[in-house]
Amino acid sequence: MSDRAFDTPVWHHGKALRKGYTTGSCATAAAKVAALMALRQQPIHQIAIVTPSGVTLNLSVESPHIEGEQAIAAIRKDGGDDVDATHGMLIFARVTLNDSGAISLSGGEGIGTVTRKGIGLPIGSAAINRTPRHTIESAVREAIGPTRGAAVEIFAPEGVARAQKTYNARLGILGGISIIGTTGIVTPMSEESWKRSLALTLEMKRAAGMTRVVLVPGNHGERFVREQMGIAADAVVTMSNFVGYMVEEAVRLGFRQIVLVGHPGKLIKVAAGIFHTHSHMADARMETLVAHLALLGAPLALLTRVRDCDTTEAAMEHIDAYGFQSLYDHLAARICQRVIERLRFTQNLPICDAILFSFDNRTLGSNRPVAAIVEDLRC
């Protein structure tokens, strides 16, 4: 289909995973082929582009249509074996030739609109990121030559529905998907792209003037913060498993207070100095619980029961039965200590807080009174 660099699989946990290509590559290819069709006045069914990473893609063209000096073409998004909300959808380009000598780019149906600062695009503009903007304009210029002009519209009929499965709304991108991709290639299980998308949320909130942020592993944490702590969802950012990365990004951006809120099953790993909490990186949950229970003087019988548990929830039942609920305040304080240690070379250390909760939405523990943490968050 394309060059060897693209066809070579990515190996992840012993499995060969197929690469894909970004919405930016789709839009670039669609715009290029539409421009060529408008110029040549004949349908084209295959198009080649060179991605920003230097990989050549040979892509099949769908729905080619020519009407005068206007042409429409679509490329079907292929995310490879990556988990991708836009996989399989058609990305269209409509190119209308003119004599202006300039290339204009706009977003049509299904392409989101930027409504907030912080993602590097003007408010009110189409959510077509800088790299795809450059590649689209370059591809169209290559196709039409140095003197002609063209109006390029990117659209995606499924965009509104697909966008509901993305983080776009949290980023202030409304009404559709984003046209993104810095390399043009989707690498399966790419943690870097995932981390970057999470960090973008931090950047957007900082650009809006926020200086205090709550970091949670996922939706359960966000719901707890909103419903049990009374904190608005705007103050909450998902960190997934990337605790260390997101804390460092928050510090880099100048946040003055960072509050980690989550279930012990995730956050107790941080108490052990584990800042990537996915199980494939490390799992010292029971060992961490046993160590801190021992420091609190827990009997050997409890330590043994906790050691033999398979889940944190099971261990918590034994901890409650033995009356060692004070463990959670102890763990929360240790989590904060670990975060501060990680940031020890930072000039302006933020306030760090941690709150642990159970699956039934009980507050288990915190490094200081929750009311004081909430009061600071509202400053």
Swiss-Prot record:
The keyword Methyltransferase appears for this protein: yes
Pfam families: CbiD
Signal peptide (UniProt feature, chain positions): none
Known catalytic reactions: Co-precorrin-5B + S-adenosyl-L-methionine = Co-precorrin-6A + S-adenosyl-L-homocysteine
Protein EC: 2.1.1.195
InterPro entries linked: CbiD, CbiD_sf
One annotated GO biological process: anaerobic cobalamin biosynthetic process
Keyword Protein biosynthesis part of the UniProt annotation: no
Coiled-coil stretches noted in the UniProt entry, renumbered to this chain: none
Keyword field: Cobalamin biosynthesis, Methyltransferase, S-adenosyl-L-methionine, Transferase
GO molecular function ontology, one term from the record: cobalt-precorrin-5B C1-methyltransferase activity
UniProt-listed SUPFAM superfamilies: CbiD-like (SSF111342)
Pathway where this protein functions: Cofactor biosynthesis; adenosylcobalamin biosynthesis; cob(II)yrinate a,c-diamide from sirohydrochlorin (anaerobic route): step 6/10
Gene3D superfamilies: CbiD-like
Family label: Belongs to the CbiD family.
Name the record gives this protein: Cobalt-precorrin-5B C(1)-methyltransferase
Organism: Edwardsiella ictaluri (strain 93-146)
Gene that this sequence comes from: cbiD
